[in-house]
Amino acid sequence: MSKQILILPGDGIGPEIMTEAVKVLELANEKYQLGFELTHDVIGGAAIDKHGVPLADETLDRARAADAVLLGAVGGPKWDTIERDIRPERGLLKIRSQLGLFGNLRPAILYPQLADASSLKPEIVAGLDILIVRELTGGIYFGAPRGTRVLDNGERQAYDTLPYSESEIRRIAKVGFDMAMVRGKKLCSVDKANVLASSQLWREIVEQVAKDYPEVELSHMYVDNAAMQLVRAPKQFDVIVTDNLFGDILSDQASMLTGSIGMLPSASLDTANKGMYEPCHGSAPDIAGKGIANPLATILSVSMMLRYSFNLTDAADAIEKAVSVVLDQGIRTGDIWSEGKVKVGTQEMGDAVVAALRNL
């Protein structure tokens, strides 16, 4: 029986980078006889334009029926003035929550070929390989009540809620420990337990889960210190587990240690490792349609999909090897280009990865 993959290009540069990722996926499908069937649909602004909502019910049904979802990016200034609850980003939040994609894996890896691209000194970031495990469907982004109210003095006050249940914390902590077990057996849990009640429960539950993983060295760090340490000495970290808000911020910070967010994929998984895969970067509307966006993060998201949702290690390794070969050849999109390298556009980069994969 064939495996179903839903392709959601999204907005901005999403369709451009997705075209290249699909080329790589189709070659891998043929080369390794993976038996994938691809279907395409819309999400975000593209869905608003077509259906009037950022995620149509039929699209959500297709996502539920699929074995994995590959996403480009959502959002753009075209939709910034519409009602908040139907903006493109709400489609992304909805598909995550409706599919139960609670565990977000965001690697921050510095490719040796791109050591000069980081804004930090080479000796600080050389060999960097961090995995941030972010809780994705709880916390302040989904908490209620939220809104704006008028105080007795006539002033408006906005408020949000940051709730976490024991079960939500326990399941994401388990993902963090599981990832640590197959990596360096080190896990740093990041919270704000000196201030937030939700973080105090977070720390308590993480400590409980740690008893099931005696081989893993567990440490705790406040989020403000973690942000500082990511810049001061990032290689002290191997796996970081944290909540939705902190993970959103820290994973973007960690991505820039590598020199370009355009290189970094991500995975969002449910309890059975069925997942949605997307680049860490956004829709970059300022460069959309120019053919200069870096497709490598989306291509590497295909590799993560093969690895985590389908356990196709050989095919996943081959795609990562193909990307490394292309970087060895000095081929670069503008965001990772440096003097003496060959600057190419989106399509040329995709073609180069396809050629490298074909020759492996």
Swiss-Prot record:
Key words of the record: Amino-acid biosynthesis, Branched-chain amino acid biosynthesis, Cytoplasm, Leucine biosynthesis, Magnesium, Manganese, Metal-binding, NAD, Oxidoreductase
Main localisation: cytoplasm
Record EC number: 1.1.1.85
Pathways involved: Amino-acid biosynthesis; L-leucine biosynthesis; L-leucine from 3-methyl-2-oxobutanoate: step 3/4
Domain of life per record: Bacteria
Protein residues bound to Mg(2+): 224, 248, 252
Broad enzyme group: oxidoreductase
InterPro entries: IsoCit/isopropylmalate_DH_CS (IPR019818), IsoPropMal-DH-like_dom (IPR024084), Isopropylmalate_DH (IPR004429)
Chain sites annotated for binding NAD(+): 76-89, 282-294
Residues with site note (Important for catalysis): 141, 192
GO CC, one annotated term: cytosol
One biological process term in Gene Ontology: L-leucine biosynthetic process
Binding sites annotated in the UniProt record for substrate: 96, 106, 134, 224
Cofactor note: Binds 1 Mg(2+) or Mn(2+) ion per subunit.
Cofactor or coenzyme needed: Mg(2+); Mn(2+)
Location(s) in or outside the cell: Cytoplasm
Gene Ontology molecular functions: 3-isopropylmalate dehydrogenase activity; magnesium ion binding; NAD binding
Catalysed reaction equations from the record: (2R,3S)-3-isopropylmalate + NAD(+) = 4-methyl-2-oxopentanoate + CO2 + NADH
Subunit composition and interactions: Homodimer.
Family (UniProt): Belongs to the isocitrate and isopropylmalate dehydrogenases family. LeuB type 1 subfamily.
Stated role: Catalyzes the oxidation of 3-carboxy-2-hydroxy-4-methylpentanoate (3-isopropylmalate) to 3-carboxy-4-methyl-2-oxopentanoate. The product decarboxylates to 4-methyl-2 oxopentanoate.
HAMAP family according to UniProt: LeuB_type1
Protein known as: 3-isopropylmalate dehydrogenase
Organism: Pseudomonas savastanoi pv. phaseolicola (strain 1448A / Race 6) (Pseudomonas syringae pv. phaseolicola (strain 1448A / Race 6))
